[in-house]
């Protein structure tokens, strides 16, 4: 599997241009430590109208951090492509944590899927940003495709589960209070 994954990564390296390099570095920086999505969650949580969405985002991000970055990364202990082939010039600092799953992809899809499940109009651009973030991790040679795929799947499942639970709880609360 690593051979195919390296072939994909090397093909992306052949497509590099200065303009796309700069764009990918910027896009990936939005996922650094999840700060963009955490700030978005805090902002949404601070308004009554979007409080539940913000809470779902922050809950998803916390769960994903614990499951993906703290537990699974250390259990899988997968080396990064840039560790295995240091001859490829990186545009970002060499990451120090393990590769599987991609934390950037995980947090981006948690945030974007939460937004999409509450508001499709804003969810589509959020999902586009999440896809670009996931792609940037491949372009920048810091993750294997399966790392990114795992982050996407985990982020989607976690966000969907949190939102589904929150919406069920809201329906239950509405029924108990007599709201239609």
State the predicted function of each range.
Residues 40, 46, 89-180:
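Membrane-embedded catalytic cores of phosphoryl/pyrophosphoryl-handling enzymes
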């Amino acid at each position: 599997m690593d051979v195919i994954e390296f072939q994909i990564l090397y093909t992306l390296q052949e497509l590099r241009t200065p303009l796309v390099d700069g764009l990918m570095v910027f896009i990936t920086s939005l996922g650094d430590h999840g700060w963009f999505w955490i700030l978005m969650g805090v902002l949404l949580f601070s308004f009554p109208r979007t409080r539940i969405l913000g809470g779902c985002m922050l809950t998803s991000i916390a769960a994903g951090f614990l499951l993906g970055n703290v537990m699974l990364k250390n259990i899988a202990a997968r080396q990064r492509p840039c560790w295995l082939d240091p001859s490829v010039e990186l545009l970002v600092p060499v990451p120090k944590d393990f590769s599987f799953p991609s934390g950037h992809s995980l947090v981006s899809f948690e945030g974007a899927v939460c937004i999409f499940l509450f508001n499709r109009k804003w969810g589509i651009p959020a999902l586009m940003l999440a896809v670009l973030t996931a792609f940037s991790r491949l372009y920048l040679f810091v993750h294997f495709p399966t790392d990114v795929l795992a982050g996407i799947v985990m982020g989607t499942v976690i966000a969907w589960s949190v939102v589904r639970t929150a919406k069920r709880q809201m329906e239950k609360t509405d029924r108990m209070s007599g709201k239609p």
